[in-house]
UniProtKB/Swiss-Prot annotation:
GO terms for molecular function: RNA binding. GO terms for cellular component: cytosol. The keyword Cytoplasm applies. It comes from Mycoplasmopsis synoviae (strain 53) (Mycoplasma synoviae). Keywords: Cytoplasm, RNA-binding. Its main location: cytoplasm. GO terms for biological process: trans-translation. This is SsrA-binding protein. Belongs to the SmpB family.
């Protein structure tokens, strides 16, 4: 499994509860830029429209000198049952966030989606403090 792009902000800003694997519908130039690892998920998010899931605000760098839209909506391929499950979870004020794009074992491009709850500032601070304490404990236990 070769990872193309990860969304570092997702783990920092959300408490991840569930993950899903989805295919993605891409054009030829988008696949070429993905193979070159020229993809960003910084501000990306997912939404459901008419029982279809779309990846929005993801950036695929232009390949060569094509006149194309780099941040268009891209359709994600999921089973109907999975889409209905996600829809039910979104009713509970959860967010659907793309966490990474990767090639699976069959060289197909997949997107890992996560259902998460947004963290507030004080939650983020607590999380950072816990991580620092764990790092210090690991250092102490090594010696």
């Amino acid at each position: 499994m070769k990872i193309i792009a990860t969304n570092k902000n997702a783990k920092r800003n959300y408490e991840i509860l569930k993950t899903f694997e989805a295919g993605i519908k891409l054009e030829g130039w988008e696949v070429k830029s993905a193979r070159a690892s020229s993809v960003e998920l910084k501000n990306a998010y997912c939404s459901i429209y008419k029982d279809e899931v779309f990846l929005k605000e993801s950036y695929f760098k232009k390949y060569m000198l094509l006149k194309v839209e780099e941040t268009k909506n891209r359709k994600l391929l999921l089973h109907k049952k999975e889409i209905l499950k996600i829809k039910q979870e979104l009713q509970k004020n959860l967010s659907l966030i793309p966490t990474k794009i990767y090639f699976n074992s069959n060289s197909l491009i997949k997107v890992e989606l996560a259902l998460g709850r947004g963290l507030k500032k004080y939650d983020k601070r607590e999380k950072l403090k816990k991580e620092e304490v764990e790092k210090k404990l690991k250092k102490i236990l090594k010696f």
